[in-house]
């Protein structure tokens, strides 16, 4: 099973690199030739227009154009194999100055984009879509419509070179651990996906126990008579004047918290979700997501997240990512700084009179409140820095939210969080102020900054904080009910969201790695590989009373999850390098790796080009060996831990170019091409 998955993964990965290196593309003789162009007036169901009422748009192609006002208009094309294609419309949109929502359906599955105002013919990018082998129907539906279509072009997708993403931290003073983690992320990006799982925070996954405080004996005891150590600094008094300790600790080190409702002690099962992953797949995720939302100045309480993060990295060798659901008072106008508030009177949503712009204005209560928020956060991050724990830090996430509800696509009217409800300008100022305070005021340099982006329209790129302000960009995928491309209305959505992946890649000109920082359903491995959706990592949200994102069969296909976790494509906790956080500033001495190219200091003289596994024959397993050696050097490289790692002879054989320019993914593709008789090795 795993061997078969590896072979399929290798083929898909290698073919994905073909486009970025300018290599061949195959077209079946009886299939549509690409790029394919069709005039708007020739679409099925279209009518011929030469002007939009009194508005003329000159220089159209063909006899005229069509105007999307009534029913669907469509065309069909044949493709030789499942794959990704780009749809471009040469069109115009003169109805709405703020842009107009448009829908293209591919075999009934809908994709959406906002088309800007254009009173002359303009190329509108509808993104990448997956077409299936054989006949495909592409339709433009009149949901909002009123788009003029001169012609439509369908092209084979051109995949950008993912290797140009930087592993240089935006913080010039980044800690060695942060630098090392970034370099590792870069080493697997575009070749593998890292598994992740979000952990619940605060009072989540509360488990009730039989432990009670006995005032007569002054002990915490459970129904079996086991005694628990009282936290002497946690004594308090209830409304009836009875003393009790808020916390006690069991023989196994578990801390329990007093429940005022039931007068017993409870604990939070923060490991519930990763244990579920272990149960379903036999593996633990490599990344665990945390949140600092409990450290709000209104009700700050220590839920132990910092200690759990230290344990995850220093004891388990796992990678930490963290978001910051920081709350503000719902009625800021009635709030006195320092006043404690119940959680119910605070929010992280946009339903507050908190003026976000005032976080940058000295003398305002918002400015001082934000300072308290950052102080609480920094106190936790400093403990992590002192413990040598780097963090993929994702503050102010999901900034854009939904598309704007006004004519200004960047005004924040679609945002659902307070930090972005006042638009892109204020959002970027807030991001910069947080980053500057953490780095300059608190001396925090263990953070790998990650920004959430969406792809509702070309204006979505306006939310990007800039190359010098973030290290990664990410997308949060929640689409089991809406925005599906599989024709279903419920159940797990295994779509890879490839179009969005490459939209985000385009926003940053390929300079940053792109992750799926949150998700409901994990995309299927086959979708990711066939579509070349090389997300850096995935990270499902946690199980809760509201939604069972991990265990719920309406969110996850557990068979697909198991197959992905046990494939060579997916990196799990046990596959992370033992020295992951230790070599941020140290060069590699055995091999040299640059942009996916591996060279060795010495090479054997007897070379059988392409025979990477040294079995005296050239086949697809050699391509697999090359890709494994490049993607996971600690396991399959020259000194890898796996018994089947590549040897010096294998590395020499794998370099299929006579110029001996080092081993790259292009060599894996060359092996595949030689296997099917397209070329002869070596390459001259």
Residue positions per predicted region:
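Cellulosome-associated attachment modules in secreted, modular CAZymes
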Residues: 19-26, 589-684
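Aromatic-lined carbohydrate-recognition surfaces of secreted/lumenal glycan-active proteins
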Residues: 394, 435-459, 511-521
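Substrate-binding cleft of secreted/luminal carbohydrate-active enzymes
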Residues: 193-200, 512-587
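Extracytoplasmic
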Residues: 29-178
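Substrate-binding cleft of extracellular glycoside hydrolase catalytic domains
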Residues: 293-433, 440, 444
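N-terminal module-boundary/linker segments of secreted carbohydrate-active enzymes
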Residues: 158-225, 231, 241, 253, ...
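Hydrophobic core
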Residues: 13-17
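Aromatic- and acid-rich polysaccharide-binding/catalytic face
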Residues: 460-488, 540-541
């Amino acid at each position: 099973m795993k061997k078969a998955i590896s072979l399929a993964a290798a083929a898909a990965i290698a073919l994905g690199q073909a486009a970025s290196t300018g290599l061949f593309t195959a077209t079946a003789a009886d299939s549509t030739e690409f790029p394919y162009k069709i005039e708007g007036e020739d679409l099925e169901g279209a009518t011929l227009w030469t002007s939009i009422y009194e508005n003329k748009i000159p220089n159209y192609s063909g006899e005229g154009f069509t105007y999307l006002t009534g029913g669907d208009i469509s065309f069909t094309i044949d493709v030789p194999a499942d794959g990704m294609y780009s749809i471009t419309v040469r069109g115009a949109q003169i109805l709405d100055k703020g842009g107009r929502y448009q829908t293209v359906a591919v075999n009934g599955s809908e994709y959406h984009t906002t088309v800007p105002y254009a009173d002359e013919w303009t190329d509108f990018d509808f993104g990448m879509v997956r077409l299936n082998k054989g006949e495909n129907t592409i339709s433009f539906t009149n949901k909002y419509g009123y788009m003029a279509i001169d012609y439509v072009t369908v092209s084979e997708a051109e995949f950008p070179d993912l290797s140009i993403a930087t592993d240089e931290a935006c913080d010039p003073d980044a800690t060695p651990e942060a630098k090392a983690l970034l370099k590792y992320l870069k080493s697997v990006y575009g070749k593998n996906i890292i598994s992740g799982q979000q952990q619940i925070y605060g009072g989540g996954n509360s488990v009730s126990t039989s432990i009670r405080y006995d005032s007569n004996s002054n002990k915490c005891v459970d129904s079996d008579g086991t005694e628990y150590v009282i936290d002497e600094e946690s004594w308090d008094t209830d409304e009836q004047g009875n003393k009790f300790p808020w916390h006690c600790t069991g023989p196994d080190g578990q801390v329990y918290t007093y429940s005022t409702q039931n007068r017993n002690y409870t604990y939070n099962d923060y490991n519930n979700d990763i244990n579920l992953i272990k149960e379903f797949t036999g593996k633990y995720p490599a990344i665990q997501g945390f949140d600092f939302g409990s450290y709000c100045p209104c009700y700050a309480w220590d839920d132990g997240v910092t200690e759990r993060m230290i344990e995850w990295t220093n004891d388990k060798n796992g990678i930490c990512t963290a978001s910051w659901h920081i709350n503000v008072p719902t009625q800021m106008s009635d709030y006195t700084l320092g006043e404690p508030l119940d959680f119910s009177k605070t929010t992280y949503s946009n339903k507050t009179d908190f003026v976000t712009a005032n976080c940058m204005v000295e003398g305002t209560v918002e400015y001082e409140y934000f300072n308290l928020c950052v102080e609480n956060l920094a106190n936790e991050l400093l403990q992590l820095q002192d413990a040598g724990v780097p963090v993929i830090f994702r503050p102010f996430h999901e900034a854009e939210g939904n598309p704007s509800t006004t004519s200004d696509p960047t005004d924040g009217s679609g945002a659902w969080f307070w930090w972005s409800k006042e638009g892109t300008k204020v959002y970027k100022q807030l991001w910069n102020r947080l980053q500057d305070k953490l780095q300059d005021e608190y001396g925090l340099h263990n953070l790998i900054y990650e920004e959430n982006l969406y792809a509702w329209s070309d204006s979505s790129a306006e939310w990007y904080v800039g190359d010098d302000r973030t290290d990664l960009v990410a997308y949060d995928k929640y689409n089991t009910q809406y925005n599906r491309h599989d024709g279903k209305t419920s159940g797990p959505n295994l779509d890879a969201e490839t179009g969005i992946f490459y939209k985000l890649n385009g926003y940053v000109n390929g300079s940053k790695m792109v992750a799926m920082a949150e998700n409901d359903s994990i995309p299927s491995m086959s979708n990711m590989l066939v579509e070349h959706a090389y997300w850096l990592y995935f990270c499902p949200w946690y199980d809760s009373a509201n939604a069972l994102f991990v265990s719920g069969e309406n969110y996850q296909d557990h068979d697909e999850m198991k197959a992905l976790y046990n494939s060579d494509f997916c990196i799990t906790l046990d596959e992370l390098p033992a020295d992951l956080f230790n070599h941020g500033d140290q060069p590699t001495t055995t091999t040299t790796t640059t942009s996916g190219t591996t060279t060795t200091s010495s090479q054997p003289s007897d070379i059988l080009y392409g025979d990477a596994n040294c079995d005296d024959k050239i086949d697809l397993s050699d391509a697999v060996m090359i890709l494994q050696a490049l993607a996971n050097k600690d396991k399959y490289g020259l000194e890898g831990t796996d018994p089947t790692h590549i040897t010096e002879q294998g590395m020499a054989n794998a370099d299929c170019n006579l110029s001996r320019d080092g081993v790259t993914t292009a060599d894996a593709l060359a092996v595949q091409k030689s296997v099917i008789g397209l070329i002869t090795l070596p390459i001259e």
